[in-house]
Amino acid sequence: IPTGIFTLPEIGRVGLTEQQARDRYLAAGKDPQQSVRVGRFRYGGLGKAQATGDIQGLLKVIVDAESDRILGVHILGAHATDLIHEAALAMHLGATVSRVAEMIHAHPTLAEGLMEAMEDVHGHAIHLARKPSS
């Protein structure tokens, strides 16, 4: 069930948190480090976020490493309560993270961030915004 928290910034979430996923695999006798993959993408890497000034935010995807199925998605940032529904639909349909990452997203949009976070699960995101090094 997708959840929206209408704070500033907004929070959108669906499915398991990273810790919940790791705990479940550990309880099942599996190595949580090998069983769970995580992809992240910062709003700062999105052209739309740059244009609107909404660069503070993060999209996080939690995935079953063996099946590539999405276990949870968490978004913190502008329009997170709207963006979470694409992830909820993908999970409802049993889509793999690879299938969602392959879907073409309009540019420039905040929704591209979900695609990039999905791509990051397998190290394929190309627009990652890195924290400045000191």
Which residues does each predicted region cover?
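Flexible, glycine-rich terminal cap/loop adjacent to redox cofactors
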Residues: 3-17, 22-134
